[in-house]
Amino acid sequence: RLFYFYSDYDDQIGNPNFDTKELDFSYSQLFRDSRFSGNDRLDDANQTSVGITSRFINNDDGREIITLSIGQIFYLEDRRVQLESSAFEDTVSNSNIATEIQIQPSDNTWLTTSLLWNSRTDTIDEGGFGVHYQTNNSSLYNLGYRFRRDSVRTLGNTRRDLSQADASIVLPITDRWSVFGRYRYDIEEQYALDEMVGVQYDDCCWMVRLLYQQSVDDQYANELNDQIIVERDYAFVLEFQLKGLGSLGNKAESFLRESILGYEDFE
């Protein structure tokens, strides 16, 4: 697959940044038309992406047993637009080499792994793996791990690497009751990043969800003792839905879909 993307430079120095972030780089990022999430920054780009995908298919049921993907972006111009106006231009001529492997040994089991290889330093900058299992009664089990080398020097001139574990579950208790939860933990810093637990009751005509969540809102360094201070957000979400008419309360469904891989509404 070959993808060329061009976007002219627009001077955005002094423009505020409310909620835009730089997207995590992965194989799928090779073929997106923006490296930012949000609308506070407009890309400047002149680049070509090259990617190769190979699939091994089971002839009996059409299932993709193994899917292998590898690709890279070649930058034809420096990227002048950055999140912060004071940041330097990005002058590297090519991205990391992105690889992804997905294995499906059975109809309800998926194994995934991804790596980002830095060809300039001959190191693996980022990687991860995950296991996704779904039973016939709509139970979901997810387990994952992700690591990343941080190229930014922080307090004490030490390198803070990223190392995170993630687990989530959806478990029907009866035909109408189900529970769900997620726990994401920072192994490097030794604290929980996200915690979520909830319960759902689903009848023929109506449905109600209640969930509790706490997540990291901000973190900063305490210069006196070289420790990380973590500030958290806490929230209860209640949603009541009359099927075919609409819902009352926050949209918990979209949040669950983003938080739990493979989550589906029980209707």
Language-model regions, residue ranges each:
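Outer-membrane beta-barrel translocator/pore domains, especially the C-terminal barrels
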Residues: 1-267
